[in-house]
Amino acid sequence: MIARIQFIKGIDEKVLPDVRLTRSRDGSTGTATFLFKNANLINKSLALNGEITGMYMIDEEGILETRDVSARFVNGKPQAVESIYIMKSPEAWDRFMRFMERYGESNGLAFTKA
C-alpha cells in the first residue's frame, strides 16, 4: 500500500507538503506542521466532492488523523492549507515517523535535520 494523505476521504492530495517537526527535549511529545501550497482541495470543483473533516495520513499500518486543518488566504483567495499533527507519546512519534518514511519513499521526499 502506498502511503498517502487525504483531506476529503477517498481523494488523495497530490500536492507535496513542507513538513516541519518539533520534539520536546525528553522526547515525550512532538508536533508536525504540514504546509500544502496550492493544495488540491483549494480547487473549487474538488471541494464539491466531499467535506473536509481533517487530514488523514494513510499507510499499511492504518490511519493517523488530525482535525487541526486551516487555510491561509492572500487577498481573499486561498493559497495554502496548514495542518498540525500532535504526538503525545514516544510511541506516537515512532508511528508518525514510520508513516513519513513510507510517504517520503512513495513521493521522493528527503528528511533533513535543521
Swiss-Prot record:
Belongs to the Psb28 family. The lineage of its organism: Eukaryota, Sar, Stramenopiles, Ochrophyta, Bacillariophyta. Part of the photosystem II complex. GO terms for biological process: photosynthesis. It is found in: Plastid, Chloroplast thylakoid membrane. It comes from the Eukaryota. Keywords: Chloroplast, Membrane, Photosynthesis, Photosystem II, Plastid, Thylakoid. GO terms for cellular component: chloroplast thylakoid membrane; photosystem II. The gene is psb28. Pfam families: Psb28 (PF03912). It is a peripheral membrane protein. This is Photosystem II reaction center Psb28 protein.
